[in-house]
Amino acid sequence: MTKTEGKTASAAVKDILLSNPDGLREVIRTVMQEVLEAEMDEALGAAKGERTPERLGYRSGHYGRTLITRVGKLELRVPQDRSGHFSTELFERYQRSERALVATLAEMYVQGVSTRKVKAITEELCGHAFSASSISAINKRLDESLKAFAERSLEEPFAYLILDARYEKVREAGVVMSQAVLIAVGIDWDGRRQILSVEMAGRESRSAWKDFLVRLKGRGLKGVELVVSDDHAGLVAAIGEVIPEAAWQRCYVHFLRNALDHLPRKHGDDCLQELRWLYDRRDLDEAKADLAAWLGKWSVRYPRLTSWVEETIEQTLTFFRLPRQHHKHLKSTNMLERLNEEIRRRTYVVRIFPNTESCLRLVRALAVETHENWMEANRYINMDDLREHKKLALRQAA
């Protein structure tokens, strides 16, 4: 038993960070060891040494396993059970995106576009320098699993569709360009979020978004009642062309950011904060009453802003058609912020991708991990609320 294994994870982590110069690596190792032991406890229905009639089996020691991460090699002790049935998904799930990141860094080095830092990182991670053939082998294994995810059939309907894009720097033919990463998330009738697609595009054009949505429909996307996105003209046009039956909700967070363009640089008052409050109202009538009061208060001081708001704000109020319990989840694209933060954290290490394929590989690997976590988590929203909401609307219309 190592020095830290007899302690709780929190106590061990504190000791490590205070005394060990390689503290971060040991913190990650300690946490992952705890995960492995907890997985075994769950599989056996009992903790180590616990006597209970619910026990499903017994432990049978450990075997060593090395996990490659960006903080170095982690030596872990994987628990075994007597029947030999226990298995963990920790390594495959964790290393998918790590392998994608390592392969990207290595590819940069082999192509001669990296720095001494990149060479040091890749050699520290894997213990050796990379050849073109070893990178190709890594990429082939990754691409096979990611392709299956990207091309899977969408058998079930998705009531809500959230679309967003972010930009990454990619080197193509010796020129560094910003390329769009298009992302689609759906919410199914079980109330779970699913990442439906992640693709690269040269830019966020109408044709790029149209092709993206057409491919989604070709894989079986159906039943979309509401699409949430920003107001990019090409995206909005593509939604209207490919999914005309769906209502559109303009992300109110993007809307409020856009409002800054219509204000003096130093306005220094609560104008936009008061506008933001109307999105917390119970229903559309309350929101419109607040809007009328807001326009009356600020129209003299900021006529350019209030005129723009009056013309465009209706696009941000579509979510009031939904059950109140769904408002906070569907009035913006904020649900994608955590995924985007994780992508940003990983891609920051690379800065400039050596090609489009390496960028897509890493972002998709991260998307698969997020998708798996979402599918195992509790449902995101209760879709019974929407079912009851629709029934009530039908009764009122009769």
UniProtKB/Swiss-Prot annotation:
GO terms for molecular function: DNA binding; transposase activity. Keywords: DNA recombination, DNA-binding, Transposable element, Transposition. It holds the Pfam family Transposase_mut. GO terms for biological process: DNA transposition. Signal peptide: none annotated. It comes from the Bacteria. Belongs to the transposase mutator family. Required for the transposition of the insertion element. This is Transposase for insertion sequence element ISRM5. It comes from Rhizobium meliloti (strain 1021). The lineage of its organism: Bacteria, Pseudomonadati, Pseudomonadota, Alphaproteobacteria, Hyphomicrobiales.
